[in-house]
């Protein structure tokens, strides 16, 4: 068993990662462990890149590395923490999840983003939301920062009468 595979298995045993994250982690691990700073030999770099690819293929083959599963779990986790679609989409794209996988995972999630936005703003600012203009702007800024769309934010004031 080569070093990248052992490292990838250890890292994936703790929590899920995307394929791009595992590739970066394995490359950083090899860079630190082999001391390639002084020996910038292309043959060594090529061999380690092949080892990393082999480790990723092995992990995918055994079901330990799955971007779709990672995206579903990430969406579930971040939505429970009060983040909206825009923020989750941006974070997952930074983690290397492609747009089709991301869109599929978002469509599969049965989250009502309007209700989530209302619960997030009530948790932050208290239950009866103020109708004052200054407070509405404050609520809107907060929800935009959390990644909610304007339509979801407006629905707080139009769809919920309480």
Swiss-Prot record:
Main localization category: cytoplasm
Entry keyword set: Cytoplasm
InterPro entries reported in the protein's UniProt record: RecX_HTH_2nd, RecX_HTH_3rd, Regulatory_RecX, WH-like_DNA-bd_sf
Top-level taxon: Bacteria
Compartmental location: Cytoplasm
One cellular component (GO) term of this entry: cytoplasm
Example of a GO biological process term: regulation of DNA repair
PANTHER family noted in UniProt: REGULATORY PROTEIN RECX FAMILY PROTEIN
Protein family: Belongs to the RecX family.
Full protein name: Regulatory protein RecX
Species of the source: Pectobacterium atrosepticum (strain SCRI 1043 / ATCC BAA-672) (Erwinia carotovora subsp. atroseptica)
């Amino acid at each position: 068993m080569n070093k990248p595979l052992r490292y990838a298995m250890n890292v994936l045993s703790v929590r899920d990662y995307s394929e791009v994250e595992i590739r970066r982690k394995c490359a950083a691990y090899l860079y630190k462990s082999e001391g390639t700073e002084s020996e910038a030999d292309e043959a060594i770099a090529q061999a380690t890149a092949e080892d990393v690819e082999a480790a990723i293929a092995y992990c995918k083959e055994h079901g330990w590395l799955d971007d779709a599963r990672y995206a579903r779990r990430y969406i579930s986790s971040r939505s429970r923490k009060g983040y909206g679609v825009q923020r989750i989409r941006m974070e997952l794209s930074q983690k290397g999840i492609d747009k089709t996988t991301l869109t599929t995972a978002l469509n599969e999630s049965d989250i009502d983003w309007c209700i989530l936005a209302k619960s997030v703003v009530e948790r932050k600012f208290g239950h009866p939301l103020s109708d004052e203009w200054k407070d509405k702007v404050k609520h809107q800024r907060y929800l935009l920062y959390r990644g909610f769309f304007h339509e979801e934010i407006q629905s707080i004031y139009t769809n919920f009468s309480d």
